[in-house]
Amino acid sequence: MCAIIGALGEHLPPEEQFIKARDTMTHRGPDDAGVYYASKEGIALGHRRLSIIDLSSLGKQPFVSNDKRFILTYNGEIYNYVELKKELAAYYDFRTKTDTEVLLAAYIQWGEQCLQKLHGMFAFAIWDTKEKILFCARDRLGIKPFFYHYDGDTFVFASEIKALLASGIRPALNERIVFDYLYYGFYDYSEETFFDGVKTLPGGSFLKLQGKVLAIKKYWDLAYRRDDVEEISMENAEEKFKALLADSIKLHFRSDVPVGLGLSSGLDSNTLLYYSEEVTGHTMHTFSECLASNEYNECLLIDEYLNKTQKKLWHRKALDADELFAFADEENKIQDQPYGGIPTIANTKRYEEAKNFDVKVLLEGEGLDEILGGYRYYRDEYEKDVARGTDGRGEKRGAQKMVSYGQDMTPAVERNVLNAGFVTTYTDAGLSFKAPFRSHLLNAQYRDIMYTKMPRVLRFKDHASMVYGREVRVPFLDHRFVEFCFFLPPHLKIQKQTQKVLLRKVMKEYIPDIVRGRDKKAFGAVQTEWMRTHYRREISSLLSSRSFKKRPYWNHAALAEKVGRFFEGEGGNSFFIWQCINLELWLRKFID
């Protein structure tokens, strides 16, 4: 995994400035760096390398094809590069052992159709020096980031927004996104970012820029298979689930550096641990964050069921309330945009611990809740389907309108704490998401995978891990596994009060009852606890600051009253206070 940057147009950043912009992302690629700068062509490509596969200097980027026509800058991993290389060997003379060269050869041979053959996470750009076409693409689920700015004259892209700003793009506030963040609690749900004019290429998309014509096209979307609800028995589903997951994990272990695992006390994480040890035949380094909290300390539970061998390679990062809050402002610098609170900071500290033990790659258990119906509110959607007698087939529903719930389906902030004029300006447009299925359950899962939960958490984890030069891999988001689980019959996801039914059935003989049977724990409970018991003074100071008082987004009197009630113990949702803190710190760092 690495950092990429590029520019195409009549007004390139000066070469020295372009290189400095690239090097704002040195943390993403501390092992090597390269640049292709051709002012006469109006093209610049830059790269910072984190060496994972083929550690030799032959993997240096930007990477040039044998005939010098194509130039690639690429971030990510193509897990099936070994198989693709065999398929391409008759057409391309390989000179390295990298997946980088395989990716470039695949594009040369198959053009944009190469994307259908790739298994992995990636964001890349290829410059065709003959046709003068810039081709850029992002993996199906948007695991790897791709931000860009295009003013109709010059196109600039990068792995992180900070690099775009360093290239000469002036930071400007996108008030519409600020409104959606405060009013609905949504962020990372669209192509727009908190910076006006800075966009993200959606997952499963590619773009072409030739001349001044920019075209973006989707090449993958779960909605493309909306009639494919699987008819499959529990027995056959178990076998296919096991086979797909084992193959995904096997591919995700392809690496020339050590691979570890982020471990929580949950079912998903422990499923990943079990299968990883089954596939590799050895115990691996695991990393957990341990919180000094009355509500939530997973390490106490993990310690109960790991065996002696596993415990020898289990690394616990002890975290206290003061340490995490002190890091909140630094996390803004890492993320470039508002982020998800104390859990994101805790993850960042865990990745720092992985760096201390020289484990360069970490597997993470993201995605099973979304693809197998694991969240509590999915039960409500499932029950709507049962009442109506639908199994997920049939005509699309159109769009889901989000009115009173935030991104985690918790009650959104009370509207009266927002400035009435600010609300009036932006509420007319509303906020809705494509709902391509007849099933309420599938549409809720689709929303979380394509728009809300997954894009958000993938951005958080990418930036949090890469600041310490750690590569996060997510085996549950192998697109084959995602498609299989998503289109399972609903009864294999939810039965009465049980969720992720198939997973629990598969793992029954492998995972301790203490893991399989426990209720899902919310990290938000820690945030609420610590805000009341540790952060009251800091929060009060920030909300009474001159800069915060000048913000036009708040009804300050109503907000002060609600915050006061929160500190007195009313309500368990602390997200609205986090919105105040996070947005204010971000505005000070990037906009003021």
Which residues does each predicted region cover?
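Polar, surface-exposed loop/tail segments
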Residues: 35-37, 98-102, 499-506, 518-528
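A general alpha-helix detector
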Residues: 1, 83, 87, 163, ...
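Cysteine-centered catalytic environments shared across enzyme families
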Residues: 1-330, 347, 514, 581
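Core structural elements
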Residues: 451-458
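ATP-dependent adenylate-handling active sites, centered on carboxylate activation for C-N bond formation
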Residues: 8-14, 37, 90, 129-156, ...
